[in-house]
């Protein structure tokens, strides 16, 4: 018989990037007594990955739990970016309600639509938390209207439209139900969760069923499956059957060696858990997302959201440049292979294939951001390698027609830059679907655009909008191929010889275009040192020094004025490289180079 478990609430937090979701979770942790009074706490404790902290994005969903008035509240932090959308869909299967965090100034952002639509489709109740009410330009009343409009657009039910609104400043650690109420702590939010989010339901006497929704990995215990107990009770040393919804033939006898529940930011070992509990299970080496752990007497899989397929791919190659092995700790193909396959333990939207050439691997992911985060992580861990230009993964329909991935791009841009954005996206086969007035002199644009049209566009977009534009994308599906796109119109400036760049050589070179390097930097023949102002590639000698005579002295060099070089970020460099180029990635440096370094061989290959 189904019963409710009143001492547990399972909630997910949904928010746009940088709307204060992780800060809000930190505050709930602090006020529920997870941290000691004198304990030093890192800001945004839920973003455990360095890149997540720096970029203010959440990549992997994380679990935590707080206790309030004898009720355990399991909180799952969801990714706010569509590249990691595969995570979101699975997380929502574990919860009974969501908190939507919205910035009191920026309002409901397009990126939130993707996750919110999924939550509403699953008929989950929503608590709307209007955050950052202490911002001077906050406009909470307008934002409430925007949120309700968004709910209607997404087909919310009448019950969902009756959702409670909580005003908060996560940074100050306060919340209230009415702006005229005194603001003291987060108690109003805690109370709303207990009152509005339903308790999990299930049959504690039925055969056990636990759906694995996310995977964690630990060097000591290996793969850890995380999921909610839907029915029955799960215990340590229990014999179970592992079944997969998409592959019913996959049935395997397993034994539960260790069982954990979440408490604060850590996992606590438990002997058993029953309905509504979110548990972590170790000891099953090939447990995967979408698997159901069942009692042997009823091996029945729980229906599950299929994992989103990758849309773009890059080649990861062992670095073979003249400077190979000088800056990295892990440089061989074995190192690269082990690290990429290790990533598959936790990232289920990723694919890694070995190529015929043992030194290269084809890595496919959900988008440019997805793969750039992997590259940045590997770089920080001491890996040295090279990557090729991102390419989209095409499909074919039953008639053999070529299909390509299409995305919706949601853009907020100052009015004066609208023209240039529409023009640039038009060149990249983007179709303007919607255009409307946003707040504060901004225009909101909505484009349907091929995934390949977005490769390398973000950096260009930021330049065109002087850093004031916001672009978000979500995957739509596959459509017939839209035709060729002309990408980079400018060629590259290529170093002619190996050595150290000098002011005299760079001074001559800067007249040809934009430089990526300054004086005193090591360069090698075939390395790209800048962008040509024209369409062709030019080879330049940036290591040449002026011949000294009685009438010319080296001190005259000091009078040469160099324009500061354009230092490319990882995303900009990935967007810049062409099909005949590679990006050399080391822990210290990013270098763009030609695939064929030798000038004569390069020209010969172009003639073929």
Where do the model's predicted regions map?
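Interdomain boundary/hinge elements
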Residues: 41-44, 154-165, 200-211, 240, ...
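Short glycine/threonine-rich beta-strand-turn micro-motifs
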Residues: 169, 355-370
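Conserved nucleotide-binding/hydrolysis modules and their immediate coupling elements
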Residues: 209-314, 324-326, 422, 490, ...
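Long insertion/accessory domains within large nucleic-acid-processing enzymes
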Residues: 262, 267-270, 403, 449, ...
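A short, contiguous, amphipathic alpha-helix enriched in charged residues
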Residues: 321-344, 559, 563
């Amino acid at each position: 018989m189904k019963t409710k478990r009143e001492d547990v609430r399972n909630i997910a937090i949904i928010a746009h990037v940088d709307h204060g979701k992780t800060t809000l979770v930190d505050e709930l942790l602090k006020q529920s007594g997870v941290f000691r009074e004198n304990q030093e706490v890192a800001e945004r404790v839920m973003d455990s990955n360095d890149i997540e902290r720096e970029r203010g994005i959440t990549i992997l969903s994380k679990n935590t739990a707080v206790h309030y008035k004898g009720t355990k509240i399991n909180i799952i932090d969801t990714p706010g970016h569509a590249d990691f959308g595969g995570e979101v869909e699975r997380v929502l299967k574990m919860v009974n309600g969501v908190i939507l965090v919205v910035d009191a100034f920026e309002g409901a952002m397009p990126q939130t639509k993707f996750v919110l639509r999924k939550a509403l489709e699953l008929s989950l109740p929503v608590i709307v938390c209007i955050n950052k009410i202490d911002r001077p330009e906050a406009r909470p009343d307008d934002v409430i209207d925007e949120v309700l409009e968004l709910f209607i657009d997404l087909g919310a039910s009448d019950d969902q439209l009756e959702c409670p609104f909580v005003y908060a400043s996560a940074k100050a650690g306060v919340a209230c139900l009415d702006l005229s109420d005194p603001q003291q702590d987060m108690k109003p939010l805690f109370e709303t969760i207990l009152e509005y989010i339903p308790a999990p339901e299930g049959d504690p006497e039925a055969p056990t069923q636990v759906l694995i929704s996310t995977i964690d990995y630990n060097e000591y215990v290996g793969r850890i499956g995380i999921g909610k107990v839907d029915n029955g009770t799960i215990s340590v040393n229990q014999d179970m059957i592992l079944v997969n919804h998409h592959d019913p033939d996959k049935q395997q006898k397993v034994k539960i060696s260790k069982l954990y529940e979440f408490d604060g930011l850590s996992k606590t070992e438990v002997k058993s858990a029953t309905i509504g509990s979110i548990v972590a299970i170790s000891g099953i080496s090939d447990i995967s997302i979408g698997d159901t752990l069942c009692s042997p007497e009823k091996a029945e899989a729980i229906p599950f959201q299929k994992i989103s397929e990758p849309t773009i791919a890059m080649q990861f190659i062992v670095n073979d440049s003249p400077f190979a092995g000088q800056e990295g700790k892990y440089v061989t193909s074995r190192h690269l292979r082990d690290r990429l396959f290790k990533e598959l333990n936790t990232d289920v939207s990723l694919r890694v294939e070995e190529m015929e050439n043992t030194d290269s691997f084809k890595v496919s992911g959900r988008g440019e951001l997805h793969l750039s985060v992997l590259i940045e992580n590997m770089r920080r861990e001491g890996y040295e390698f090279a990557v090729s230009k991102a390419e989209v993964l095409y499909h074919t329909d039953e008639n053999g027609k070529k299909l390509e991935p299409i995305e919706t791009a949601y853009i907020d841009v100052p009015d004066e830059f609208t023209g240039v954005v529409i023009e640039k996206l038009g060149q990249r086969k983007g179709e303007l679907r919607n255009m409307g007035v946003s707040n504060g002199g901004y225009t909101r644009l909505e484009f349907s655009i091929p995934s390949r049209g977005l490769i390398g566009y973000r950096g260009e977009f930021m330049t065109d909008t002087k850093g004031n534009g916001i672009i978000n994308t979500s995957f739509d599906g596959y459509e017939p191929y839209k035709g060729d796109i002309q990408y980079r119109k400018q060629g590259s400036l290529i170093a002619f010889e190996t050595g150290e760049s000098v002011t005299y050589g760079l001074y001559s070179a800067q007249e040809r275009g934009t430089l990526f390097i300054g004086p005193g930097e090591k360069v090698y023949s075939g390395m790209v040192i800048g962008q040509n102002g024209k369409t062709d590639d030019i080879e330049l000698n940036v290591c040449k020094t002026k011949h000294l005579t009685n009438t010319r002295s080296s001190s005259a060099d000091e009078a040469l004025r160099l324009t500061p070089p354009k230092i490319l970020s990882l995303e900009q460099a990935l967007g810049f490289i062409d099909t005949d180029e590679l990006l050399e990635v080391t822990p210290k440096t990013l270098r763009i180079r030609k695939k064929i370094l030798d000038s004569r061989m390069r020209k010969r290959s172009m003639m073929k």
